[in-house]
Protein backbone atom coordinates (compact mmCIF):
# COMPACT_ATOMS: atom_id res chain seq x y z
CA UNK A 1 0.00 0.00 0.00
CA UNK A 2 2.98 2.27 0.55
CA UNK A 3 5.07 3.25 3.53
CA UNK A 4 5.10 5.71 6.42
CA UNK A 5 8.06 7.85 7.32
CA UNK A 6 8.47 9.61 10.67
CA UNK A 7 11.86 11.28 10.70
CA UNK A 8 11.63 12.50 14.32
CA UNK A 9 11.67 8.89 15.57
CA UNK A 10 13.74 7.57 12.66
CA UNK A 11 11.31 5.08 11.18
CA UNK A 12 10.31 4.20 7.65
CA UNK A 13 7.90 1.27 7.64
CA UNK A 14 5.80 -0.52 5.02
CA UNK A 15 2.02 -0.20 5.22
CA UNK A 16 0.10 -3.45 4.73
CA UNK A 17 -3.62 -4.12 4.39
CA UNK A 18 -5.21 -5.38 7.60
CA UNK A 19 -4.14 -5.70 11.21
CA UNK A 20 -3.39 -9.40 11.61
CA UNK A 21 -0.51 -10.48 13.84
CA UNK A 22 1.47 -11.41 10.72
CA UNK A 23 1.05 -7.89 9.31
CA UNK A 24 1.81 -6.10 12.58
CA UNK A 25 4.94 -8.15 13.22
CA UNK A 26 6.57 -6.80 10.06
CA UNK A 27 5.13 -3.34 9.51
CA UNK A 28 2.18 -1.02 9.94
CA UNK A 29 -1.38 -2.21 9.37
CA UNK A 30 -4.16 -0.28 7.64
CA UNK A 31 -7.34 -0.66 9.70
CA UNK A 32 -10.11 -2.20 7.62
CA UNK A 33 -13.03 0.12 6.87
CA UNK A 34 -10.94 3.25 7.39
CA UNK A 35 -10.01 5.45 4.43
CA UNK A 36 -7.24 4.21 2.16
CA UNK A 37 -3.95 6.10 2.60
CA UNK A 38 -4.37 8.22 -0.52
CA UNK A 39 -5.56 11.49 1.02
CA UNK A 40 -8.45 13.75 0.08
CA UNK A 41 -11.28 15.61 1.78
CA UNK A 42 -13.57 13.59 4.03
CA UNK A 43 -10.96 10.89 4.67
CA UNK A 44 -9.55 9.44 7.86
CA UNK A 45 -6.89 6.76 7.47
CA UNK A 46 -6.16 4.63 10.53
CA UNK A 47 -2.72 2.97 10.75
CA UNK A 48 -1.77 0.63 13.58
CA UNK A 49 1.57 -0.65 14.75
CA UNK A 50 3.07 -2.72 17.54
CA UNK A 51 5.14 -1.21 20.30
CA UNK A 52 7.91 -2.87 22.24
CA UNK A 53 8.48 -6.01 20.20
CA UNK A 54 11.90 -7.45 21.05
CA UNK A 55 12.63 -8.02 17.36
CA UNK A 56 11.48 -4.67 15.96
CA UNK A 57 11.14 -0.99 16.79
CA UNK A 58 7.94 -0.32 14.79
CA UNK A 59 5.79 2.23 16.75
CA UNK A 60 7.79 1.88 19.99
CA UNK A 61 8.73 5.58 20.04
CA UNK A 62 5.39 6.95 18.85
CA UNK A 63 4.92 8.63 22.25
CA UNK A 64 7.92 10.87 21.47
CA UNK A 65 5.92 12.77 18.85
CA UNK A 66 4.53 16.20 19.75
CA UNK A 67 1.87 18.41 18.25
CA UNK A 68 3.35 20.16 15.24
CA UNK A 69 5.61 17.24 14.24
CA UNK A 70 5.20 15.86 10.73
CA UNK A 71 4.96 12.41 9.25
CA UNK A 72 4.73 11.33 5.64
CA UNK A 73 2.81 8.64 3.80
CA UNK A 74 4.26 7.52 0.49
CA UNK A 75 1.46 6.03 -1.61
CA UNK A 76 0.60 5.88 -5.32
CA UNK A 77 3.75 7.78 -6.29
CA UNK A 78 2.71 10.68 -4.04
CA UNK A 79 4.03 11.94 -0.73
CA UNK A 80 1.29 12.98 1.68
CA UNK A 81 2.44 15.23 4.54
CA UNK A 82 0.61 15.28 7.88
CA UNK A 83 1.11 17.63 10.81
CA UNK A 84 0.32 16.17 14.25
CA UNK A 85 -2.63 18.12 15.65
CA UNK A 86 -3.89 15.81 18.40
CA UNK A 87 -2.41 13.24 20.77
CA UNK A 88 -4.70 11.25 23.07
CA UNK A 89 -4.67 8.18 25.27
CA UNK A 90 -7.99 6.32 25.20
CA UNK A 91 -9.47 2.97 26.20
CA UNK A 92 -9.62 0.36 23.40
CA UNK A 93 -13.40 0.75 22.97
CA UNK A 94 -13.26 4.56 22.67
CA UNK A 95 -13.37 5.18 18.92
CA UNK A 96 -15.02 8.60 18.58
CA UNK A 97 -11.72 10.20 17.55
CA UNK A 98 -11.42 7.81 14.60
CA UNK A 99 -14.48 9.07 12.72
CA UNK A 100 -14.34 10.92 9.42
CA UNK A 101 -14.72 14.68 9.89
CA UNK A 102 -16.37 16.66 7.11
CA UNK A 103 -13.90 18.52 4.86
CA UNK A 104 -10.87 17.13 6.74
CA UNK A 105 -8.04 14.82 5.67
CA UNK A 106 -6.72 12.99 8.73
CA UNK A 107 -4.46 10.05 9.44
CA UNK A 108 -4.34 8.58 12.94
CA UNK A 109 -1.49 6.37 14.12
CA UNK A 110 -2.42 3.90 16.87
CA UNK A 111 -0.35 1.79 19.23
CA UNK A 112 -0.81 0.22 22.65
CA UNK A 113 0.13 2.09 25.81
CA UNK A 114 1.48 2.22 28.48
CA UNK A 115 4.57 0.47 27.24
CA UNK A 116 4.55 -3.18 28.33
CA UNK A 117 1.08 -2.96 29.92
CA UNK A 118 -0.99 -2.24 26.79
CA UNK A 119 -4.32 -1.49 28.50
CA UNK A 120 -4.94 1.75 26.57
CA UNK A 121 -4.38 3.08 23.07
CA UNK A 122 -2.19 6.01 22.05
CA UNK A 123 -3.77 7.97 19.19
CA UNK A 124 -1.54 10.35 17.25
CA UNK A 125 -3.60 12.22 14.67
CA UNK A 126 -2.19 14.25 11.82
CA UNK A 127 -3.99 16.69 9.57
CA UNK A 128 -2.93 16.82 5.94
CA UNK A 129 -0.75 19.77 5.04
CA UNK A 130 0.89 20.76 1.79
CA UNK A 131 4.01 18.74 1.10
CA UNK A 132 7.11 20.83 0.52
CA UNK A 133 9.77 18.80 -1.36
CA UNK A 134 12.49 20.75 0.47
CA UNK A 135 11.33 19.03 3.68
CA UNK A 136 12.56 15.76 2.20
CA UNK A 137 16.19 16.86 2.31
CA UNK A 138 16.50 16.07 6.01
CA UNK A 139 14.60 12.81 5.78
CA UNK A 140 16.19 9.41 5.62
CA UNK A 141 16.16 7.52 2.35
CA UNK A 142 16.93 4.24 4.09
CA UNK A 143 14.35 1.71 5.21
CA UNK A 144 14.44 0.92 8.94
CA UNK A 145 17.08 -1.59 10.04
CA UNK A 146 14.26 -3.93 11.05
CA UNK A 147 13.24 -4.29 7.41
CA UNK A 148 16.82 -4.92 6.31
CA UNK A 149 17.35 -7.61 8.93
CA UNK A 150 14.11 -9.39 8.01
CA UNK A 151 15.75 -10.06 4.64
CA UNK A 152 19.40 -10.47 5.65
CA UNK A 153 18.92 -12.97 8.51
CA UNK A 154 16.89 -15.55 6.54
CA UNK A 155 19.38 -15.36 3.65
CA UNK A 156 22.31 -15.91 6.03
CA UNK A 157 20.53 -18.84 7.68
CA UNK A 158 19.77 -20.39 4.30
CA UNK A 159 23.39 -20.00 3.17
CA UNK A 160 24.65 -21.55 6.41
CA UNK A 161 22.25 -24.47 6.03
CA UNK A 162 23.36 -25.05 2.43
CA UNK A 163 27.05 -25.00 3.42
CA UNK A 164 26.44 -27.49 6.25
CA UNK A 165 24.46 -29.80 3.96
CA UNK A 166 27.14 -29.58 1.27
CA UNK A 167 29.94 -30.38 3.74
CA UNK A 168 28.03 -33.37 5.13
CA UNK A 169 27.69 -34.76 1.60
CA UNK A 170 31.43 -34.38 1.00
CA UNK A 171 32.32 -36.12 4.28
CA UNK A 172 30.09 -39.13 3.51
Region annotations inferred by a language model:
Residues 1-149:
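Solvent-exposed, non-transmembrane regions of membrane-associated and secreted proteins
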Residues 137-172:
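C-terminal single-pass membrane-anchor helix
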Amino acid sequence: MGYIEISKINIKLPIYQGTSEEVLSRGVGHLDYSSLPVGGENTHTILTGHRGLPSAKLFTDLDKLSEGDRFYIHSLDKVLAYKVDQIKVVLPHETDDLQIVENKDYTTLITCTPYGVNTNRLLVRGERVEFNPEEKQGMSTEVSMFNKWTVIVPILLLCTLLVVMYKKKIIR
